[in-house]
């Protein structure tokens, strides 16, 4: 979920990590277990390894009908990292249904006149569609981003051109007021906010609110490094202070990139050896609605549509003065779970007298939930949280979304004292959950009419998503369906696994407080899963 990068990307450090093989630790094959006592001994032995012994572990393993197979500290609270997404995505699937869609609109105060002139602002209105990107849908595990980053926005510009718009006498406005302007969750690290995994949350989202920066060495030592943006409009949005230089071929790269919170200046510094491949980074967009307006304005002008005004953003500042920890506990009555055959559409309100010049409908909800869980997409989970608050609470805010999730967890049988979330993605280090809450939720999901759809959103061991390089050998390959979670000193895995005898187990393994250099923790987690199923090894 979270990159190892801090405020400054030290590419030399990344290279050093890959060369030294810090992730190459291997466990011995797990001893075959035949009963609860043997399983407890096997897991306890795994947790006595030096890296694991220094950390704090919470484990819950149960059958689908709730019988306890193994537990360790399962009633204690842990930081879940991206395992928090399980709470957000199950709630969204149950309440919205798999077929729900979201509409983005381009509106104006009136239709174009006979000459194709629109008098007044043209407004791009977002309603929380996270699929406005170059991402491939449905998720296929290989070609995640084959399309141009702004292809969805280009389609809206094409629609205006087909409609005969020739001139806009006003501004191009990016409107994200469907949600209050709360771009970040509580406790998010300031050094995360410039990267893709910490992108700001907006009801008007394009390309996951991310642009791509390529940094290339010059021809000779001493030459300036060169930069290129994708999409090109990012070069108009961000300014670059570039002091990076080309170093001698074969020398160690030492390249840094930095953007201060709230700033639109990107600083590039350090060295990149001659002949070195380009370095590619995904940078968060500071203000997605403003960026979308700027990109849309340029697209219209590229199609011969004159625009007299500027590209501006329209936000709605939060007016909530209540204490979050109190507000989120207010009771809420939810509707019944959505029938899987039903389909609802979420659309922004249309002001009186306004006309829709163009519109775009998102992919079905299930397709986006799959991306959210498979690749652990933070922004998409945060948008889901706000959509839940908007539709089933009183506003598209963090606290209202959290109220909806909390109310749904009561329905799922999760004890209210067993979890507390400050966001929808798990990026907040302040989030807390017990392992037993995880397995309770997963058992509930397995009992619902949408259980197969939900399981299909999870990474599959050895096959796809964040588990593509774990559980790569039989019998666990293709038999582990689980959500990963990673933050500083946090590692987690929760989901389903099939035993040798065909029985499905539900598990949650939460590890907190390990040392940053403890690269073997995921291997320990995988070995615990293997022990629970009686598998000989995980690879």
Indicate residue ranges for each PLM-predicted region.
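Short active-site loop at a secondary-structure junction
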Residues: 71-91
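Residue-level preference for non-acidic, small/hydrophobic
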Residues: 66, 85-92, 172, 204, ...
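A short, well-structured edge-of-sheet supersecondary motif
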Residues: 48-72, 312
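Bacterial N-terminal signal peptides that target proteins for export
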Residues: 1-9
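Conserved serine DD-peptidase/penicillin-binding transpeptidase domain
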Residues: 23-50, 94-416, 500-501, 523-527, ...
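Bacterial N-terminal signal peptides
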Residues: 8-18
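A short glycine/serine-rich beta->alpha loop
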Residues: 73-78, 282, 425-428
């Amino acid at each position: 979920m979270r990159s190892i990068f801090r405020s400054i990307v030290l590419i030399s450090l990344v290279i050093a990590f890959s060369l030294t093989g810090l992730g190459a630790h291997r466990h011995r094959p797990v001893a075959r277990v035949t009963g609860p006592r043997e399983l407890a001994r096997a897991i306890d032995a795994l947790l006595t390894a030096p890296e694991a012994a220094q950390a704090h572990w919470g484990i819950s393993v149960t059958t689908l009908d709730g019988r306890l197979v193994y537990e360790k500290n399962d009633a204690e609270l842990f930081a879940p990292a991206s395992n928090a997404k399980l709470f957000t995505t199950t709630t969204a699937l149950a309440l919205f249904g798999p077929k729900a869609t979201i509409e983005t609109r381009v509106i104006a105060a009136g239709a174009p006149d006979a000459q194709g002139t629109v008098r007044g602002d043209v407004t791009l209105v977002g309603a929380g569609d996270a699929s406005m990107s170059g991402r491939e849908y449905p998720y296929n595990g290989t070609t995640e981003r084959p399309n141009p980053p702004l292809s969805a926005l280009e389609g809206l510009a094409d629609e205006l051109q087909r409609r005969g718009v020739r001139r806009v006498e006003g501004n191009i406005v990016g409107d994200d007021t469907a949600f209050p302007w709360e771009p970040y969750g509580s406790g998010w690290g300031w050094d995360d906010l410039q990267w893709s995994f910490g992108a700001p949350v907006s009801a008007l989202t394009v390309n996951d609110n991310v642009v791509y920066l390529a940094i290339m060495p010059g021809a000779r030592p001493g030459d300036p490094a060169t930069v290129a943006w994708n999409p090109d409009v990012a070069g108009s949005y961000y300014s670059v202070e570039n002091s990076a230089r080309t170093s001698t071929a074969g020398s160690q790269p030492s390249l840094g990139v930095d953007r201060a919170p709230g700033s639109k200046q990107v600083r590039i510094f350090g060295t990149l050896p001659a002949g070195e491949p380009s370095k590619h980074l995904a940078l968060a967009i500071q203000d997605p609605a403003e960026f979308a307006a700027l990109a849309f304005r340029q697209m219209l002008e590229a199609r011969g549509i004159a625009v007299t005004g500027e590209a501006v953003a329209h936000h709605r500042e939060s007016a909530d003065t209540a204490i979050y920890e109190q507000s989120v506990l207010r009771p809420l009555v939810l509707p019944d779970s959505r029938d899987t055959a039903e389909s609802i559409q979420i659309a922004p309100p249309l002001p009186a007298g306004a006309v829709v010049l163009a519109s775009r409908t998102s992919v079905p909800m299930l397709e986006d939930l799959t991306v959210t869980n498979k690749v652990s997409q933070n922004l998409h989970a945060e948008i889901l949280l706000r959509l839940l608050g908007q539709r089933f609470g009183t506003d598209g805010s963090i606290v209202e979304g959290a109220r909806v999730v909390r109310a749904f967890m009561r329905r799922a049988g999760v004890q209210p004292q067993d979890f507390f979330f400050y966001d929808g993605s798990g990026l907040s280090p302040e989030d807390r959950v017990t392992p037993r809450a995880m397995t309770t939720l997963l058992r509930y999901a397995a009992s619902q009419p949408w259980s197969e759809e939900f399981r299909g959103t999870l990474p599959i061991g050895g096959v796809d998503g964040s588990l593509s390089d774990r559980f790569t050998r039989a019998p666990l390959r293709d038999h582990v369906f689980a959500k990963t979670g990673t933050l500083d000193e946090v590692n987690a895995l929760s989901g389903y696994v099939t035993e040798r005898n065909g029985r499905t187990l539900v598990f949650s393994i939460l590890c907190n407080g390990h040392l940053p250099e403890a690269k073997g923790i995921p291997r320990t987690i995988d070995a615990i899963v293997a022990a629970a199923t009686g598998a000989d090894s995980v690879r």
